[in-house]
Amino acid sequence: GVMGSTPWCKLDKVKFLCPAPGYDRHFGITEHFGIEMITIPMTAEGPDMDLVEEYVKDPAVKGIWCVPMYTNPLGITYSENVCKRMADLNPAAEDFRIYWDNAYCVHHLYDEEEKQDHLPEMLSMCKANGKENMILEFASTSKISFAGAGISCIAASKDNLDWVKKSMTVQIISHDKINQLRHVRFFKDLNGIKEHMKKHAAIMRPKFELVLDVLEKELGGLGIGTWTKPLGGYFISFDTMEGCAKAVYQKCKDAGVTLTTVGATYPYKKDPHDTNIRIAPSFPSMEELKQCAELFALCVKLASVEKLLENK
């Protein structure tokens, strides 16, 4: 088990807190292992901490998934207040961990610092509260160098790292040291990564701005949808009127545009209000993206009109 605790497979019930909308692959992991997922609604500042603080009183709750910076899919960054409360949690389970997936820590869309989000440093905050073992922070170069072929890293207390290394020794004989060296020689240091990410931003920024411009032009002020305006990350989160997301998805698909499957951003793929759609602008060309965004806006209008007529 976690640092000598009872292995989860020997417990009757294991639960995880899942801020949602959130990362579908996190939810896929917990679902695969039969771990009960508890949906924690997201606010503009991060997870609803009143609920988090209440749920961790249950010793069966063993962890919480967090993408704290430019969250997938909302694109928001946890506020200092949320981070402070997270770092001061009092979980009943000694093996409770905050799984702090800082995947988008350098993924800014703008070079100017005032147009970038900033995230408090959580390991030192937890340590200051005497809770340094409560957090496992990890990230990778998946969206920096090579998707699925970069390098990953973990930051944690010495106790946690000793425990992790003990498991990793069994899992793998040796990591790809040539790939590690390749990354070190290419990036050299943190400044090298920041400079490289400016090149990513130069590609991503106009795509985000294009989609946001189309949404504002076509849907602004109509009251049939809301959307985030991220300063970084890879996604724009769009909320339709209640009960319309699946219809929008299907209309787009029928017209030749494939969106992220509706519901994917929630545990068990169940969006309780059928509203959330994750928009990923990175892949299409600018010309294709403009067509896709305009078609998406049209499908939102059609689905909304149908819903309003249905409710008359």
Regions found by a protein language model. Name each.
Residues 63, 97, 136:
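Hydrophobic "anchor" residues on beta-strands that sit immediately upstream
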Residues 1-94, 105-130, 245, 297, ...:
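Conserved core of the PLP fold type I
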Residues 131, 254, 269-312:
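PLP-dependent enzyme catalytic core of the Aspartate aminotransferase-like
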Residues 241-245, 284-286:
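Helix N-cap motif at beta-to-alpha junctions
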Residues 32, 124-205, 217-218:
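Conserved core segment of the aminotransferase class I/II
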Residues 101-102:
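Walker B catalytic acidic pair
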Residues 198-212, 224-239, 253:
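Conserved glycine-rich beta-strand-loop-beta hairpin in the small C-terminal domain of fold type I
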